Structures are given as structure tokens and as C-alpha cells.
């Protein structure tokens, strides 16, 4: 048991794009920060300035310090934060920080680590990134080299931490060799707030987004980036609508590939069967899950896949790529189907099994909901507290 089980902590969560986009790591950080604060801890976020957040502000009721930044091209709201060591040292002193939690290994993390080491503050590092998230658009010939460079950088980040956190066992198996020998670590799911996603109401969602409610609706939620392989899903649609004209695909999310994906849909003659919703509010995202019939994630790389958990919490059957670098495939167990990575014909076959069979959709949906109970975010927050307390026990 941790030495300080009742101590309320002062925690600095370092996440450069905090509040500036809706990626999984940002959503997870916001949720963890809010729940940690509700449990009595003092939490602050350190992130990058943006057009939306030029000054220090609050996100989910948590104080956020935003610093000078540089945007990452084609990143859809990802900015690199550049506070100075002096600035973070001052903030960490003023906030009496006990633990610095690195959520992303970006520029803000490097500076936060230097400030934390200067003050003797404990560091916990979280694994939220894969080379596939960064280098998939680079020429294939240089991707292995870039991956090795990235791993050496992660070794430096992880080597400065008292302990490491992985969202899944797969993430630990992929990344644990980048940490120090015998370094304490924990597997903590990003989790899901079951109460938040259990509402079956969709309000006027269908009307506002012009989606016909009588159709069988497929749903994708995520960034429109190469590693999400959304083109595979769009290419599967012609075969599906050939047999079921009442099938419709909803795509929630933004990214630099949107125009290319819209053009692909147009070239395939299926524009009327797809709605690109773009970025939506958290409330409308939940409405989208509940308005859908089948959730599809064709991603090539996922260290967990929070959107799959969200779909499961809404009681939806899931269809997921069997990609080697995707932990999301492990969510599929009598609640949906796997399909061969980037094989749009196989994806169409798996989707049609569910489009053709409403009772099977209902069965798989119920199983998804039951399985989602194993990922209650409140248990994840308790585990996160234990990781912090364990880090405080460690020696500098």
C-alpha cells in the first residue's frame, strides 16, 4: 500500500495540446484532471497557447497555464508549448507541485522535466504515442530510421521518470524496453464514464445533421489522419449500399485528409450515403454514438482506442481492424467482428453480417455494454492515485 494514501496531492499534468483539440490524449487528460480535482487534489494543466486559448484559463474546472507555442503542420490543432524552465519552476513552486505527470512527450514535457528535476519533484510518464501516429506520411524508406530516433527520444523522457503508465498491456509490451531497468510501471486504462455515455436520448441530432433516422447507420469517430485508415471504410461502402441502400455512414472528426476522403466518396458515387460531421461537441458525440447502429474503427495503430470504449458504453456492436499495432482489436470478443487490415472487401463482409441481422446487432450491443463496465474511469483514477503515491515513495 502507498505510504501517503490520504495525502491530497498537487499535480501538474503536461499536455501541449490541452484544450486545443479533441484527440484521445487531450480528452483523457481533461477527464482525469477533472476527476482528480473532484477527489480533493489540486491539479493544473501545462499546455500551448492557441487562437482559442491565448492566456491562462480553465478546462473542465482545472486551471490551465498556456505558453508561447508553434503549430505542427497538418496536425489539426496540435501546438508545441515552449515555456521556459524559469517559468515552470516558478509555477511549480507557487502551486507546491508534488508530482509532474507527462502525458505527451512533446516540447512542454522536456521543459517540465528540467524544472521538476531542478526542484526534486517526482515525475510520472504516460505512454500515449506511437511512431505510426507521427511518421505514416513520411516516405516508407525513412520510416524505420525515424522510428528509431523517436524511440531514443522516448528513452530519454521515460528515463527521467520515477514510474511509467501504459493504457494497455499491449502498450507495455511495445514500450517497456524504452524505460529504465526494473522501472515501476502500471497498466491503467483511459477508462470511460459509464453514466455520461448511457443516455439513449439523441434529441434532434438526426434533423440537425440531416441523417435519416430510418437508415442503418455506421459510425466512425476520430482524427482524419493516415493511421486511422478511414479510406478503407469509405471504399467498403459501395459493396454495402449495393445490397442495402438504406445504409448510411457518419464520420465524426476533423483532419487534413477530409477533402481527400470527400473526393474519394464522390469518385465512388456514394456521397449521399456519407455525412461528414466534422468536430462536434461532447454532447453531440454521445448523440452520434446513440444514433448509430454499428461502430467501425479501421485504425492501423491504437495504444487503446477510447472511441471503441465509448461505443461499447453506448451498447453498440463494434467492427475493428486486426492491425498488429492496434490494441483496440482486443476489445472484440462476442460483441463484434475483426476484419483484415486495410482490406475493404473483408470490412464490407463483416459490416454486412450485422446490417443483415438486427438480432445479432442487439446481442453484440448488449455484450459491448457489459464489457464496458470493466473500464470504469473512476477505477482508473484510483489506480492513477496509487501510481502517484508510489512515485512519491521512490528516491531521487
Q: Residue spans of the language-model regions?
A:
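Short alpha-helical donor nucleotide-sugar binding micro-motif in glycosyltransferases
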Residues: 92, 158, 279-280, 287-292
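Conserved acidic donor-binding segment of nucleotide-sugar-dependent glycosyltransferases
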Residues: 333, 337-344, 353-359
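Short hydrophobic beta-strand element within catalytic cores of glycosyltransferases
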Residues: 317-322
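N-terminal subdomain of nucleotide-sugar transferases
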Residues: 1-56, 60-66, 382-385, 389
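Conserved donor-binding/catalytic core segment of Leloir-type glycosyltransferases
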Residues: 212-228, 234-237
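Carbohydrate-associated surface elements
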Residues: 49, 170, 191
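A short helix/loop element that forms part of the nucleotide-sugar donor recognition site in Leloir-type
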Residues: 198-211, 217
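Aromatic "clamp/platform" in nucleotide-sugar-dependent glycosyltransferases that forms part
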Residues: 300
